[in-house]
Amino acid sequence: LTETPYHYGTIGAPTDNYMMFRRNSGRFGMNMFYGEFNYRHSFTDRHFIDFVVGYNKWKGDNDNYYQDSTVYYNDAALPTDYSYQYRPMRMNSNAWEVKLDYENPITDRFKLQAGYNGRFSHENTPQESFLDGSSWNGDNVVEDRAYYNRFIYDMDLHALYATLSYNIGKFGVMGGLRGEYWRVNTESYSWEQEHDASKREPAFKKDYFELFPSLFLSYQITPTQQLQLNYTRRLRRPWGGQLNSFKNTSDATVISYGNPELTPEFSNSFSLNYLKTWTQHSLLVSAYYRPTTDVMQRINYQSSEDGLMYQTNFNVAKSTSTGLEMTAKNKLWRILDLTTSANFYYYKLNGFDFDIDGQTVSGEGNHNFTWNARMQASLMLPYDVSFQATGRYRSRQVITQGHSDPSYAVDLGLRKSFLNKKLVLAVNCRDLLDSHKRKSYTESEMFTRYQENWHGGRRVNVSLTWNFGNMKQKRRPQQNMENQEESFGSQYSGSEME
């Protein structure tokens, strides 16, 4: 439950013209099913083929209630206005993943790895709206067809890869190439288009084929020290919601919508690494340089037609990150594993300008020094019980048209194995302190905006897993859980980095 006052008037005036008070409440339910089949064919202990098929079905019922009361100060004759909105959204998503991995140590020095990865996902999510324009409690709600939307999203991904590694003396080299074909179709229906197929516009379709080379060079200084020089090309893809052109008015201060023209962003990563190992500890220090093109960022603008604030995503500019990352792993008293990482870097985002809504939207280049840290503690307890705690912190960072404030979060997990580890019960609490929110400040010549975004708040998840056969247990994917760390409707939302 949140209660927010909105003040409307002229800057510098002694009083507001009017004030709207909004109460927002809601409930969210989620059901998820995940199944996975693993098979390994071994030619020898080191020469094998792995085959994995996974299926994930996810449903979420999201009900939001908005109660508004508006008081007019500049005209005492006007009565207080009341309105009630109910907006249910039924999220439906399913996905298949197929993996085939081949590994063959041809000689003691030469190894071949190759494989295929396919992902096939489908989302069909209707959103409805019911309105009572004269009541606080919603006594006489009617269907509000202007805000109906059905979003359909289909994504197919096919990737083939091959890597060759060769070691001679203290030197090692590994080179690889991944070819990726990505296809996405999106459809967004209004109420009229939902009920009359002849009014629907053709699905928005796009596809890409890209090559991603990688090269890793290493030198073993001593048995416990190693130098590495690496290069990889990566991409980050937009997620479905960033491509939905439906204009969402649930926020009283801004109308947000997706951009079907949004394309992936690409990075070239160069790094020099130093690795030091001890019996129970290790330290990895990495200096890196990472230029990125077609950076996906969320931009704000005031419409020249209706004067309202709008928010959407664009491939705005180029960026560069130059920094130092350190990762330490420590095993203490045989029962406690600590993994600590810290990333210190200088971030530069270039300026941009483009035409939208009959006007030129621009942003100046910006830069700052920023850092983030993450610590994970895993504790092994008696009776096949394990406990895990994870803490994350991100400092202030520049974004398009402004900056985002620091943020932090804590997650907890408890795991218990039964029947010789065939049956596993896991309880996880995401965002224990209910602190995982994103605060951002943006401005231009036309506006100044401060925004806070939450993403579900504290959540508890209980899962029961049964393992059979001889395959080693693998971590089950979580529906968009990891990506939420950088989401909150920001330029990082739910995107995929590879």
Spans of model-derived segments:
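Signature of Gram-negative outer-membrane beta-barrel scaffolds
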Residues: 112-224, 354
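Conserved C-terminal beta-signal and adjacent last beta-strands/turns
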Residues: 215, 366-498
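Surface-exposed extracellular loop regions of Gram-negative outer-membrane beta-barrel proteins
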Residues: 183, 223-269, 289-311, 430-445
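Residues on the lipid-exposed face of transmembrane beta-strands in outer-membrane beta-barrel proteins
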Residues: 35-41, 98-104, 160-166, 215-219, ...
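Transmembrane beta-strands of outer-membrane beta-barrel pores
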Residues: 1, 41, 55-61, 118-122, ...
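Surface-exposed loop/turn segments flanking beta-strands in extracellular/periplasmic regions
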Residues: 4-20, 67-84, 122-150, 187, ...
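Outer membrane beta-barrel strand-and-loop segments of large Gram-negative receptors
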Residues: 95-99, 142-148, 257-259, 263, ...
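Repeated loop/turn-to-beta-strand initiation elements of outer-membrane beta-barrel proteins
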Residues: 46-49, 109-112, 170-173, 224-227, ...
